[in-house]
From Swiss-Prot:
This is Tyrosine-protein phosphatase. Keywords: Hydrolase, Protein phosphatase, Signal. Monomer. It holds the Pfam family Y_phosphatase3. It comes from Nostoc commune. The gene is iphP. Belongs to the protein-tyrosine phosphatase family. The keyword Methyltransferase does not apply. InterPro entries: Prot-tyrosine_phosphatase-like, Tyr/Ser_Pase_IphP-type, Tyr_Pase_AS, Tyr_Pase_dom.
Amino acid sequence: MKTHHANLALALMLGLSSSATAVAADAPQAVATKAAAPNVKPVAADAHGVIPDGAPGMCARSPACRATAIPADAFVRTADLGRLTDADRDALAALGVKLDIDLRTADEEAQSPDLLARDDRFDYQRISLMGTEKMDLQKMMTSFPDSLGEAYVQWLGHSQPQFKQVFQRIAAQQDGAVLFHCTAGKDRTGIIAGLLLDLAGVPKAEIVHNYAISAHYLEGQPKDSDERADHGAGQAEPGDRPQDGGHGRYRAGQHGAVLAALHSQYGGAEGYLKSIGVSEQEIQQLKVRLGQAG
């Protein structure tokens, strides 16, 4: 995996219009075409790479952050992959994606099947970060506190077995890029990305920007999780609740509060992973993938 230095640290899929096409890494128009979400200041490097025409999230390879060298082809983050074209799948294969981790519930997957799951070029695994039964999700949502930051901290505690499984599966992947996605491409993927970035020693401000910029790119996207939550389907994520403002209104300070709580309660991502049963060897393997060891 090649190592590059720049702004965001991970190869990401961030939400853009499904009709978008490829964007050059240094093209300022890529960030000037959409109004930024509150508290977000996009830079040209935030839009970079190949954009699947059929996906509600773009396939964007974010260059590595300024302070920490992370392989630019280590991870890909995206939204729902139920509308990928053949060309989209070819583009992901060309990016080196080998593993697709679907963070959605069984109901979400049934409503919009992941099209990489039936492509032999990709290994597919679904690990729901929101529980296994609809009633569990509804109970979890009603118990969330008013603060989105507090909700994320509770989420880290509530879904420890699922987080453990996700990071163990990533650690076990020896080659290629690891793609992880949910429905909206923001909350579940965002918290996984945040933990990876923190494990790599990325500065807090850049982790917050990494999360908040997704709201910028999600502007104008169908609020699938919001709509399903309104109809009682039980698939809402914390940031999709009406009191949290939905997509595009995320307050960056809230994610900063999550990071502060992560360090206060667990000593950071590494401490959290150890507390949920991820082994020292697996953490070392994660660091190798992140370009921080080996």
